[in-house]
Design a protein with these regions (language model features):
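A short, N-terminal "cap"/entry segment at the start of jelly-roll beta-barrel domains
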Residues: 1-27, 107
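Conserved short histidine dyad/triad with adjacent acidic residue
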Residues: 29-45
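Ligand-binding loop in jelly-roll beta-barrel domains
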Residues: 80-104
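A cytosolic small-molecule/anion-sensing beta-strand core signal
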Residues: 55-56, 71-72, 90
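Short acidic-glycine-tyrosine-enriched beta hairpin
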Residues: 65-80
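Short strand-coil-strand connectors
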Residues: 26, 62-66
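Short, conserved beta-strand element in jelly-roll/cupin
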Residues: 34-35, 46-61
């Protein structure tokens, strides 16, 4: 089925304040996040390449040792196995693209 209504996908709270709806293809995962102000994902890393796209609000993102507050229209490219963390400065919506598929989000 090539067409998806993201609103029909049940959200999954991965950590408190980070709720995601996930779309999977054969090779990629797209995560539609709703992030609450003050919610954080601590430093972590994974084998997946990741592209971050802020849609609304503000997100503080640290990649390696560099930190920036991203606003709507801004993003970041995070290579495989690079430590990163994120905090909602405001309530925000973010779309992340992962390669390869995030099997841990595929349930």
């Amino acid at each position: 089925m090539p067409f998806i209504n993201i609103n029909e996908i049940k959200p999954k709270e991965v950590v408190p304040g980070f709720s995601g709806r996930f779309i999977h293809s054969e090779h990629t995962t797209v995560a539609h996040w709703e992030i609450k102000a003050g919610a954080s994902i601590p430093f972590h890393q994974h084998v997946h390449e990741m592209i971050v796209n802020v849609i609304t609000g503000k997100l503080e993102l640290t990649v390696g040792d560099e930190t920036k507050v991203l606003e709507a229209g801004m993003g970041a490219v995070i290579p495989s196995n690079v430590p990163h963390k994120a905090t909602g400065v405001t309530d925000c919506k973010v779309i992340d693209v992962f390669y390869p598929v995030r099997q841990d989000y595929n349930n």
